[in-house]
Amino acid sequence: MTLLSDNKAVLIAGPTASGKSALALELAQKAGAVIINTDSMQVYHDLRVLTARPAPEDEALVPHRLYGHVDAAVNYSAGHYVRDAAQVLDEVRREGRLPVFIGGTGLYFKALTRGLSAVPPVPDDIREAVRLKLDRDGVEALHAELARRDAAAAARLNVRDRTRIARALEVIEATGRPLADWHAETTPPLLPPERTHALFIAPEREALYARIDARFETMLEAGALAEVERLAARGLDPLLPAMKAHGVPALIRYLRGEITREEAATIGKADTRHYAKRQFTWFRHQLPEFEWMSPEAAKGLVRALKVR
């Protein structure tokens, strides 16, 4: 594979803690590239430490875009991301620079390379009404309502899946159409697969899991707990994406005195390991065009680059 050819964008995906950021930084420094975040949690300003965003000194070395530009109170979606990414990509191309998209959120990569379903934004008042109904009546009642209004969606969703049940009802309430109808309509992709070089960094599993555990402890020592304490003090909706970032719910429980610090760390590590496992499975089945390689092979590929 040649990473620098034909004005193609570079996509670097992989599980959390796989060394993607360091690889992207080395590539960007060598090629004069712009690094564009493709991680759904690193967009949040409030969670620099706990989401392992690039360090400020690394961000100063090359341009980094779409990091920390969203407040935790925002229900930031793949649709928001694609709109922001389109603007950044246009700017990068006008500058004549190489765009390097890096992250672990498969849905974002799929939206970039396959297009996005055309679901219109749900008005805030409808979203709030559904959330209030969820809190008042419980998830089983909402699932029963969904079964009456969109039987196919209700059959697909777990009866305890609060987030997806609420989302399906919001879309029906706002548009009068089931979510599946909207998913059948997609927008043209920003980055068709033939216009990209796409890598998936695949470390050895046990080494990755050990690195995840060690990194979680490092993040706690580096200020993640204080970060979560500030976030919890805002009293935000626990269903917001930022409030469900790996480690946030467990650390909030610790701050409330419900569990010990050790228990919170154990939960946070386990949640992150399970997420990494799902990332392997998701990319293998959903985006088979990504070329899988070990971190060592990817580093060798970058270091062998000859930049004109």
Curated annotation (Swiss-Prot):
InterPro entries xref list: Dimethylallyltransferase, IPT, P-loop_NTPase
UniProt-annotated site: Interaction with substrate tRNA, residues: T105, R127
Cofactor(s) the protein needs: Mg(2+)
Catalytic activity: adenosine(37) in tRNA + dimethylallyl diphosphate = N(6)-dimethylallyladenosine(37) in tRNA + diphosphate
MF term (GO), any: tRNA dimethylallyltransferase activity
Residues reported to bind substrate: T16, A17, S18, G19, K20, S21
Binding site for ATP: G14, P15, T16, A17, S18, G19, K20, S21
Cysteines engaged in disulfide bonds, as pairs: none
EC number in record: 2.5.1.75
Signal peptide region: none
Pfam families: IPPT
Region spans: Interaction with substrate tRNA: 39-42
One GO term of the biological process aspect: tRNA modification
SUPFAM superfamilies: P-loop containing nucleoside triphosphate hydrolases
ATP-binding in keyword set: yes
Alphabetical keyword list: ATP-binding, Magnesium, Nucleotide-binding, Transferase, tRNA processing
Enzyme class: transferase
Record note on quaternary structure: Monomer.
NCBIfam families: miaA
Similarity section: Belongs to the IPP transferase family.
Reported function: Catalyzes the transfer of a dimethylallyl group onto the adenine at position 37 in tRNAs that read codons beginning with uridine, leading to the formation of N6-(dimethylallyl)adenosine (i(6)A).
UniProt name for this protein: tRNA dimethylallyltransferase
Species per Swiss-Prot/TrEMBL record: Bradyrhizobium sp. (strain ORS 278)
